[in-house]
């Protein structure tokens, strides 16, 4: 006989499975951004192309150059990549079509000049 109470949690989200040490690294990216820009600046919206470019810079630094941490922020490059992926997911969930400037087969990327 168990002294533990009954809990019907089958099918519920398992937050306990997330690697918290890496979530903390992602939180450091958000914290750095809140100081460099302002809190919640990313929620104002960044174009998909700018997010993609930043994601690729961090991915390139980690993948091809073997760097682990960004020199400016001190944040792990993969945490920065995760930040931009979360931006994409948030903007898509929020229906921010105004930010979606992905190129298509018939329309090349636009210049940011």
Where are these regions (language model features)?
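Intrinsically disordered, low-complexity regulatory regions
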Residues: 1-113
């Amino acid at each position: 006989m168990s002294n533990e109470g009954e809990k019907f949690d089958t099918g519920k989200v398992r937050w306990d499975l997330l690697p918290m040490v890496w979530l903390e690294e992602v939180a450091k990216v958000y914290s750095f951004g809140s100081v460099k820009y302002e809190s919640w600046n990313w929620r104002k919206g960044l174009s998909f192309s700018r997010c993609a470019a930043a994601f690729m810079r961090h991915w390139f630094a980690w993948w091809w150059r073997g760097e682990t941490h960004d020199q400016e922020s001190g944040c792990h490059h993969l945490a920065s990549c995760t930040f931009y992926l979360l931006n994409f997911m948030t903007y898509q969930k929020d229906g921010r079509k105004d930010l979606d400037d992905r190129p298509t087969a018939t329309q090349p990327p636009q210049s940011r000049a």
